[in-house]
Amino acid sequence: LGRYLFYDGRLSGRTHPDSLMSCATCHLQENSFECGIDHPVYQEGHPHGLTGIPTPHLMLPLINLVWNHNGYLWNGRLWKDNPDPYRRNIEDLVWMGVVAPHEMNGDTNRTKALIASIPGYPPLFKKAFGTDVVTMKRISMAVAQFVRTFISSNAKFDRYMRGEVQLTPSELNGFVLFTTEEGADCFHCHGGFGNPLFTTNLFYNNGKDTVFPGIDDRYAITGDPMDLGAYKATTLRNIELTGPYMHDGRFATLEEVINFYSHGLEWSPYINPLMHHIANGGTQLTPTEKADLIAFIRTLRDEEFLTNPAFGPPDQLP
């Protein structure tokens, strides 16, 4: 049921061909359920909704979210203990996507009425929930459960860790750089040996800026000045397919990202203390080290995830 709804443009509550929009309109499987810089409609990875209003940030990929317990979106404004009961989990993300002006710009009553009117859907709700009554809560639950099945665990690096393949010398050197403070120092925020998610799902000021309006960063949620300029550390799984990078898409390529961490960091009083190389402006990687690091990061590409038909569009919608 969730798979059908995820791919059904009528989730927007409309039937006109120019007004159809589904979750999959922006969240493309081939881009790790992110938009990607090469999206056929949204140039340079900057999506907008049916109203033409651009999204305030680049989207985050929908990958391994079942293990994210530290909040959703770039600033974590949805978290499990949020006093607002409608801003807590993936189900609420689905709801928000339907009504947000920069996404489907829909109306929940219109959406549930339209879905209920499609003959194939009530029997599917009956199978899933024991009743054929369509509600927005059940729509959100079904889509959220489908999204929770988006698990990536079979990249080349996963197979290396299972002893099934070997890394090249360049990839292996990149792995060493990734997991050492003296190297590229990536692992504090993006995991390593003991964190196969390749993210902590936490929020960091990583030295991108020196001026912070505090409007949409982590500070806007916590009110803690040390969260000024802090945004979620994204997973690095399939990262080569999810550019442009950072919350505002300022870097188009992985090479630009690595150059930034190597020699482009900017100090501020709010820099995260894990940015150990801030005094030098970055990790000062050599060209060979940069190439090795990118070679390792590309071992996190999971072709099985990107092509799994269970995650893809159904042959026919109800």
Language-model-detected regions and their locations in the chain:
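Periplasmic c-type cytochrome electron-transfer domains
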Residues: 1-318
